[in-house]
Amino acid sequence: MRCLSTLIGLLTATVTALAAEPQRATVVSIDQDKFCINGQLTYKGRIWNGHPIEGLLMNSRMVQATFDDRNPKTVARWAYPDTKRWDPDRNTAEFIAMMPTWRKHGLLAITLNLQGGSPEGYSKSQPWHNSAINADGTLDEKYLARLAKVIDKADQLGMVVILGLYYFGQDERVKDEQAVMAGVDNAVDWLIAQKYTNVLVEVNNETNVKAYDHDILKPDRVHELIERVKKRSVAKKHPLLVSTSYGGGTIPKPNVVKVADFLLLHGNGVKEPKRITQMVQQTRQVEGYRPMPILFNEDDHYDFDQPNNNCIAAVKAYASWGYFDYRIKGEGFDEGYQSVPVNWKTSSERKKGFFRLLSEITGEKP
C-alpha cells in the first residue's frame, strides 16, 4: 500500500533527526485517491448509506485560528464583546481548547493560512494586516508561534492541517515576485525545521480570484510554486504534499492537476448539490488527472438537516468536504467560524448541524 510505503519513507528520511527530537505523532500520506494517517486509511472500514467514507478527509475552514491585525487603524474592529479589545493569544487559545471536541465528532482536518482570510466572511476591500509573511518574504515570529501551537495540537489529536501560504486579500503585503518565492521557501523550511508530518500545503487560496497582485500566484503560473515546494522539500528529505485551490464552482486547470498531489475545490456560490457532483466528475476528466484525492475545503452552503446538500453530494461522489461558516449580516457573536472575533464553541444551530451530520457520516460519536 502506498500509504504505508510513504510513511516508511518519510520516517526513514528523518530517523536521525527524530532520535534527537520528539517524534511527531501524526503522519499524513496518500494512497491513490485516498488519505491515510499513520499508514492507515482514514475512517477505516466506514460505509455510510452505501457510500465509502474510508480514505476521505472531512475538514473545516478555520483560518482565523491565528488571526491578528497589524494595522492600528482597523484592529479595534475585532474587539471581543466582553473585554472591548482584541487579543490574538486568547483567540488561538480558545481555538485550541475546542479542537478535541471537533475531533471527537469526526473532523480530521482544518484549513489555516499564513495570510488568513476575510475576518468579515466576504469583503470588498481588506485594509487590515493579517500576514505571517513580511514584505520581503521573511516570516513573523509571533504569528509562527501561534501557528505552531495549533499544528502541535493537531498532531497530538491525530489531525491534519491544510496550510495555505497566500491569500488574495493580503498578497499585496509582499513586495514582489522574489519575495513571494522567498515566502514559500521560508514556509517550507519552517515546516521541515518543526518536523511536521501532518501538514498538507495549499500554495494559495483561490488562485483564480482576480484580486491577486503577483502573477506567480495566478492560474497560469501557480504550478511553478507547487513544483517549488515539492522540489525544495524533497531535497531536504522531508517531502511535502502540495496543491492549490480555486474559487467556488471552478474546475482545476491541467497545469495544476499535472503537478499537484491532491486537488482542492470550493463550493461557494454552488447552490445546487448536483453541481457539486458535476464538479467532481469534471475534475476527474481534466488532462493530467490520475487517481488522487479531491477535497472541497471551503463551502458556505449548509442545509444540514435536509436529505441532500453540498456536503452529502460531495461524499456520495467520493470527495472530502469542508465547512466554511461566516457571520451573516445581522448575526451575533455566537455565529460563524470565519468572522472575527470568533466564538470557537459549537455555539450556533448551524455549527451544531454540521457536527451532527459529520458525526453521522463518519460514525465517530463524541
Language-model segment annotations:
Residues 183, 199-200, 204-352:
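Extracellular glycoside hydrolase catalytic/binding regions
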Residues 20-27:
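Cleaved targeting-peptide boundary
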Residues 5-16:
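Bacterial N-terminal signal peptides
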Residues 9, 29-30, 144:
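Generic hydrophobic-segment detector
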Residues 26, 33-37, 41-89, 287, ...:
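Extended substrate-binding grooves/exosites of carbohydrate-active enzymes
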Residues 36, 40-42, 47-260, 266:
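Active-site mouth of glycoside hydrolases
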